[in-house]
């Protein structure tokens, strides 16, 4: 394997490892968000878009080159004279096998690049939704406690007004009632926002689960291709060993 394809294969292995690492269930999105917000990652993200575009262009060129090689060595019978050169068939099969292997490596590297970028985006969105959900929940709890407190004070004021109507300041009572209504409205708004945030969070979790299932399917497909690669390599090496014997 040449240096460029060794580099692409190493990059593919790193992508598979990164996808599996991001799909680990016991690492919460909040922890990943802390990692994404670190100085080192932010420095990488600063130049990340340019690097991603350059990477995609390189991988697309490699895929095109692999397809060109496959088409070049696809029809062996029209290009090889078996009577004058009987060993050329094995040579062409070897070239075709390498071209197909390179296509798999470059294609999966390109696919996992988009998958990895999308997975990081979904994890960041899920962490943001979780944080906002907790903030809304705390606001709703504090508003609920304040509303209960003002309702108790309102009840006490009503009892005091019933017992000592002449001594009670009517203006303060009306102010408390208005504050109570305002707090009830705020509590209702916070509950609506909390319900909306929960729906967004469920949607993000479903998308993350779908991406995880997709990455697991890609990993299984990659393992299957590795097994086919090993079988093809063994079948190609077999005739060569027999010929040398």
Curated annotation (Swiss-Prot):
<feature type="site" description="Cleavage; by caspase-8">
    <location>
        <begin position="164"/>
        <end position="165"/>
    </location>
</feature>
<dbReference type="InterPro" id="IPR008417">
    <property type="entry name" value="BAP29/BAP31"/>
</dbReference>
<dbReference type="GO" id="GO:0007283">
    <property type="term" value="P:spermatogenesis"/>
</dbReference>
<dbReference type="GO" id="GO:2000060">
    <property type="term" value="P:positive regulation of ubiquitin-dependent protein catabolic process"/>
</dbReference>
<feature type="coiled-coil region">
    <location>
        <begin position="165"/>
        <end position="236"/>
    </location>
</feature>
<dbReference type="GO" id="GO:0005886">
    <property type="term" value="C:plasma membrane"/>
</dbReference>
<keyword id="KW-0256">Endoplasmic reticulum</keyword>
<dbReference type="GO" id="GO:0032580">
    <property type="term" value="C:Golgi cisterna membrane"/>
</dbReference>
<dbReference type="GO" id="GO:0044233">
    <property type="term" value="C:mitochondria-associated endoplasmic reticulum membrane contact site"/>
</dbReference>
<keyword id="KW-1133">Transmembrane helix</keyword>
<dbReference type="GO" id="GO:1904154">
    <property type="term" value="P:positive regulation of retrograde protein transport, ER to cytosol"/>
</dbReference>
<dbReference type="GO" id="GO:0042288">
    <property type="term" value="F:MHC class I protein binding"/>
</dbReference>
<dbReference type="GO" id="GO:0005789">
    <property type="term" value="C:endoplasmic reticulum membrane"/>
</dbReference>
<dbReference type="GO" id="GO:0030136">
    <property type="term" value="C:clathrin-coated vesicle"/>
</dbReference>
<feature type="topological domain" description="Lumenal">
    <location>
        <begin position="2"/>
        <end position="6"/>
    </location>
</feature>
<dbReference type="GO" id="GO:0000139">
    <property type="term" value="C:Golgi membrane"/>
</dbReference>
<dbReference type="Pfam" id="PF18035">
    <property type="entry name" value="Bap31_Bap29_C"/>
</dbReference>
<keyword id="KW-0812">Transmembrane</keyword>
<dbReference type="GO" id="GO:0006886">
    <property type="term" value="P:intracellular protein transport"/>
</dbReference>
<comment type="subunit">
    <text>Homodimer and heterodimer with BCAP29. Binds CASP8 (isoform 9) as a complex containing BCAP31, BCAP29, BCL2 and/or BCL2L1. Forms a complex (via C-terminus) with TOMM40 which mediates the translocation of components of the mitochondrial membrane respiratory chain NADH dehydrogenase (Complex I) from the cytosol to the mitochondria; within the complex BCAP31 interacts directly with unprocessed and processed NDUFS4 and NDUFB11. Interacts with VDAC1. Interacts with VAMP3, VAMP1 and membrane IgD immunoglobulins. Interacts with HACD2.</text>
</comment>
<feature type="transmembrane region" description="Helical">
    <location>
        <begin position="7"/>
        <end position="27"/>
    </location>
</feature>
<dbReference type="GO" id="GO:0097038">
    <property type="term" value="C:perinuclear endoplasmic reticulum"/>
</dbReference>
<comment type="similarity">
    <text>Belongs to the BCAP29/BCAP31 family.</text>
</comment>
<feature type="topological domain" description="Cytoplasmic">
    <location>
        <begin position="124"/>
        <end position="245"/>
    </location>
</feature>
<feature type="topological domain" description="Lumenal">
    <location>
        <begin position="65"/>
        <end position="102"/>
    </location>
</feature>
<dbReference type="GO" id="GO:0033116">
    <property type="term" value="C:endoplasmic reticulum-Golgi intermediate compartment membrane"/>
</dbReference>
<dbReference type="GO" id="GO:0070973">
    <property type="term" value="P:protein localization to endoplasmic reticulum exit site"/>
</dbReference>
<dbReference type="GO" id="GO:2001244">
    <property type="term" value="P:positive regulation of intrinsic apoptotic signaling pathway"/>
</dbReference>
<keyword id="KW-0813">Transport</keyword>
<keyword id="KW-0053">Apoptosis</keyword>
<feature type="transmembrane region" description="Helical">
    <location>
        <begin position="44"/>
        <end position="64"/>
    </location>
</feature>
<dbReference type="GO" id="GO:1904294">
    <property type="term" value="P:positive regulation of ERAD pathway"/>
</dbReference>
<dbReference type="InterPro" id="IPR041672">
    <property type="entry name" value="Bap31/Bap29_C"/>
</dbReference>
<feature type="transmembrane region" description="Helical">
    <location>
        <begin position="103"/>
        <end position="123"/>
    </location>
</feature>
<keyword id="KW-0653">Protein transport</keyword>
<keyword id="KW-0472">Membrane</keyword>
<dbReference type="GO" id="GO:0034976">
    <property type="term" value="P:response to endoplasmic reticulum stress"/>
</dbReference>
<dbReference type="GO" id="GO:0006915">
    <property type="term" value="P:apoptotic process"/>
</dbReference>
<dbReference type="Pfam" id="PF05529">
    <property type="entry name" value="Bap31"/>
</dbReference>
<dbReference type="InterPro" id="IPR040463">
    <property type="entry name" value="BAP29/BAP31_N"/>
</dbReference>
<comment type="function">
    <text>Functions as a chaperone protein. Is one of the most abundant endoplasmic reticulum (ER) proteins. Plays a role in the export of secreted proteins in the ER, the recognition of abnormally folded protein and their targeting to the ER associated-degradation (ERAD). Also serves as a cargo receptor for the export of transmembrane proteins. Plays a role in the assembly of the mitochondrial membrane respiratory chain NADH dehydrogenase (Complex I) by stimulating the translocation of NDUFS4 and NDUFB11 from the cytosol to the mitochondria via interaction with TOMM40.</text>
</comment>
<dbReference type="GO" id="GO:0044877">
    <property type="term" value="F:protein-containing complex binding"/>
</dbReference>
């Amino acid at each position: 394997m040449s240096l460029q394809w060794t580099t692409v294969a190493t990059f593919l292995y790193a992508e598979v490892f990164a996808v599996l690492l991001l799909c680990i269930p016991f690492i919460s999105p909040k922890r990943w968000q802390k990692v994404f917000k670190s100085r080192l990652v932010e420095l990488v993200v600063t130049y990340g878009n340019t690097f991603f575009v350059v990477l995609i262009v390189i991988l697309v060129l490699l895929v095109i080159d692999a397809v060109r090689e496959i088409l070049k060595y696809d029809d062996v019978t029209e290009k090889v004279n078996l009577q004058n050169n009987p060993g050329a068939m094995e040579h062409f099969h070897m070239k075709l096998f390498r071209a197909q292997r390179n296509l798999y490596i470059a294609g999966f590297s390109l696919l996992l690049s988009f998958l990895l970028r999308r997975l990081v985006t979904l994890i960041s969105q899920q962490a943001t939704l979780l944080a906002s959900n907790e903030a809304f929940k705390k606001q709703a709890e504090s508003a609920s406690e304040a509303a209960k407190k003002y309702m108790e004070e309102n009840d006490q004021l009503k009892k005091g007004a019933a017992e000592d109507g002449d001594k009670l300041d009517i203006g303060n009572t009306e102010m408390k009632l208005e504050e109570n209504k305002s707090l009830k409205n705020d509590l209702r708004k916070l509950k609506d926002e909390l319900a909306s945030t929960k729906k967004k969070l469920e949607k993000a979790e479903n998308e993350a689960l779908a991406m995880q299932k997709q990455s697991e399917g890609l990993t299984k497909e990659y393992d299957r291709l590795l097994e086919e690669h090993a079988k093809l390599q063994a079948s190609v090496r077999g005739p060569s060993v027999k010929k040398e014997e």
